[in-house]
Structure formats: structure tokens, C-alpha cells
Amino acid sequence: MQLPYSEELNIEYLGRLFDNTTECYKFFWFKAIVTKVTAGKYELTYEELVDEMIADAYFMVTEYHLNLGPKDALEGIVNLIRIKNPALKSCEKQSVIIDFLKNTQDKEIISKKRALTYNVPYRLQSPFMENVKGKEWNVGESRLIAKINQENRLIYYFEALNGLSTKIIVQSDWAQYIIKNQEIIKGWLEYKMITYIQKRNPSVPGIADKLYPPYERNLERVKKYWRLILSLEPVHEIYGDNILTENDLSIDHFVPWSYVAHDEMWNLNPTTKSINSSKSNNLPDWNTYFEKLVRQEYQSYQMLWKYDAVHKEFDKCAKEHINNDDIRYRIYRKGLEFTEFAGELETIILPVYQSAKNCGFTNWKYQNVR
């Protein structure tokens, strides 16, 4: 992706910010700068940028279980926050995370926030500083700041070192360039992040959907399909064996959406609102629930070929929720016996399930607390 040309600024150096990146800090640091600059702030403290970095990484680690790097301190501080504050949800709003980080008095968290600033504020702009090489980077922060502040035409410069209160000053010409071209710059940054994170998580699908907090998904078409089925035959949900009703119907992703990042019908099953909330983004125990899932799905499969109205509703659903013709043929074609249907569904779901399990999604069994 090509960044917009500028006669005044060296865009070639900007385009090299993430060359040879082995850890994720540069992406999150620059993303935080872009966020602040486009909001009209040019003087930024280390602390507000670090808080933004942690909030941006939070849901990637807690909700999506992404690996951000081999020794990633950003991932480590997110995990520490969850351990010390279990009340924080995995899909917590970024504003809540930032407020927590601003107000925390926890010495360990503050220390780890400071540790995030030891290198990235200085190293990010290394493409602009071709004269600074090798061991010249390995000096104290104050000396490094003095050296960097002598360089010409950087994106930002530093005020005196003062821990997390240290300020960077984004230069006005760079700020105007970022604001003017913010959509292209954000797209370029997103592309670079996707490439990096995909390399760290080669078996994880839908990385592009996991750079941002989870969004509200539209499963109304699937709900309508199951409501029609419920009006024709009783259906038991698979976790608590309750008979489903139209008034208490929720659509669950068997393998969590936060892993698969899609709404394909073969991974969707009807349950109750409270059970779906309880399950959250955990993995249902395979030995306990997969056969029940098969029986429920096979019931709907049989009705698909028994009732014209169900078939018609299924076809409407399939336009949005079955995006693979091979899978549609394998598990929805006419004439499948139960064992054949079960075998096909297992070959589709099990590899995805195992991959999610390997990424750290928690095994779950429903506990009826009545």
C-alpha cells in the first residue's frame, strides 16, 4: 500500500517504520499517536500513549486470545490486569480500560507501563536516523533523547525525561499530514498489523476482524429460521436440555465467534439467553456436547427436507450464513443418514475446535444454578 506523497516530508522513511519488526510495540505506539493526533492533540505523555496501547491490545489478548509476540510485555501487562481485576470483562470498553489505567495505584502495573517506554518511543523513528547505528542506541534514555532531538525532520521530538510524564511533541507538518491522510494511514497501519499478527497466529482465522472490539452481530435471519422450526416441532437446546421457546431464544456460536470471526450456520445453534450469556466465549466440552449438537442440527436438517416453509427459510438464511458451496453440499444435501451427517459435521467443526483450544479458549460445561 502506497502512502500519499509529500514535497515537505520524507514519506519513504515513514513507510519503513515497521521494517524488521519482531515485537508488536511499534504498531500500537504509532496507532496511539495517530489516534491522538487526529483528535487534535500534538503534545502527548508517555502515559496516555501507553494507556491507549494497552486498551487497544486488551481485547485482542483477552477476547481473541491472540499471540502478540514471543516475549511480548504488552500481552503480559494485559494478562496481569485481568488477574488482578477479574471483574473486568474480556470485551470491556476501551474507555473503561483507559480509566482504570489512569487511576490505578498498583505498583506492579505502573512499573510494567513504564517498561513499555524503554525502547519503542526512540526506536520507532529509526528509519529517519540513518546515522544512529548499532551500539549508539544502547545508551541511557536521557542521552538518547538528547541525540534524537538533534536530528532533523522527525515526526516527533522529546521534552526532558520524566518517567511516564515524559512528553513527545508531534511536529505540526507531520500532524497535518496525518490528519489530512488519516484514512489511508489507518488502512496502511491496519494492513501492516494484520500481516504481523497473522504470522504470529498462523492457524487463527479472521485476523482482520480481530484488530477492533467485537461488534454486534445480526443473527435475526437465523433466529427467524429457528422460530419457524420451533413452531413445528419441539427442540431441546444442547447445554441444559431445555425445550426452547420463541420468547427465550438466543443464537450461540458453538466454537466462539471471537475465534472463528464468522456466522456460518454449521457453527450456530439455538439456546436460551441466560445459557448463551453463561457460555460467553468459552469452548463447550466436546465429549459432552458435540453429539447433542449433531442431533439438534440433524433434526433441523430433516425438517429442511420435510417442510417447504422450512426449506424456503433455510435458503434465505444460506445466502448470508453459508459461504462455502462444498460445505453446503456435504451437510445439507438431500438423503443423508444420521451417521453420515454426523461424520461430515465432525470433519468440518473438529479442526476449528482443536485450533481454538490450542489458542487457549477455556473448556466449559453448563452449571444449572437453579
Protein language model features and the residues they cover:
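Short, charged/polar micro-motifs that form catalytic or ligand-binding hotspots
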Residues: 15-23, 230, 258-262
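Mixed-charge, low-complexity interaction segments
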Residues: 1-222, 287-303, 370
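C-terminal structured domain segments
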Residues: 289-366
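Hydrophobic/aromatic-lined pockets within catalytic cores
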Residues: 34, 38-41, 58, 230, ...
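Active-site-proximal structural scaffolding
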Residues: 7-10, 26, 230-233, 247-250, ...
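Short cysteine-rich loop/turn motifs with clustered Cys
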Residues: 221-250, 272
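Short Cys/His-rich Zn2+-coordinating modules
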Residues: 214-225, 251-257
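Histidine-centered nuclease catalytic patch
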Residues: 241-270, 279-292
